[in-house]
UniProtKB/Swiss-Prot annotation:
PANTHER family associated with the record: SINGLE-PASS MEMBRANE AND COILED-COIL DOMAIN-CONTAINING PROTEIN 4 (PTHR34644:SF2)
Name the UniProt record assigns to this protein: Single-pass membrane and coiled-coil domain-containing protein 4 homolog
Subcellular location: Membrane
Bridged cysteine pairs (disulfide): none
Keyword Transmembrane: yes
Family, similarity comment: Belongs to the SMCO4 family.
Protein topology in the membrane: Single-pass membrane protein
Assigned GO CC terms: membrane
Keywords in alphabetical order: Coiled coil, Membrane, Transmembrane, Transmembrane helix
Main localisation: membrane
Organism field: Culex quinquefasciatus (Southern house mosquito)
Recorded coiled-coil stretches: 8-34
């Protein structure tokens, strides 16, 4: 059993299970929300740099 912060009481099985479920939920949100957003931001930065650094041909 794990000691909770600031007290002598210990975690019950139910509390431990709830904590594990909460951690799994956070990991799932990381995969479904945070990583795609980071990917989109990265692609936007790459596209911006590409468009700003490509050679331009001026017609006479």
């Amino acid at each position: 059993m794990r000691k909770l912060r600031g007290g002598q009481t210990r975690e019950t099985r139910k509390q431990k299970q709830e904590r594990r479920e909460e951690n799994q939920k956070i990991q799932q949100q990381l995969k479904t929300i945070v990583l795609p957003i980071c990917g989109v931001v990265f692609l936007c930065i790459v596209a911006y740099v590409f468009l700003k650094t490509r050679p331009r041909f001026e017609e006479l």
